């Protein structure tokens, strides 16, 4: 759980932290000699605590990534298949045969544009209050997901940011999951435009009573009114 009540607590400073270093503490102005002394804790102590918290969350993170990057036989992602086939058709028309280019196209279109946004902003889907602590922690998880989808080699060293170092060991395995997901999508039976339209119509019928269109229209209007001068 990422609820503040489940975060590790520094018994001396009464501060919470999770998958990020408490840099906000270090940036605060000095108030007393004792408080200043508390802030001189070795970075290794913080790293140990971060690794401990990471271990607690590891199974949940693994399950999350597998849920995102897996295909259910009873409900294959037809829209993803149709769109990925479109990208492959565009690559073929333009004489692009480099598989890395297609990987980048697919990654930029779905994992990075959609899933990373959801990972960093769960309030878009769930009725929750995202605190600053949770926001920082979700950014670490989102970074791990981004690295998993990348094809570039991770260049890590002692000066690398903690959010990249924390999951460096798991990234190779996560990348295999991403590649397997793309391959499974590619091996699915292609859809015609008529089949895709029928699928979208069926999905619309399923949820036609789940949303308040008036509220949605009001939100769109407020958005348009706000940015109309621009």
Give the label of every model feature segment.
Residues 1-230:
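Extended alpha-helical scaffold/tether regions of large eukaryotic proteins
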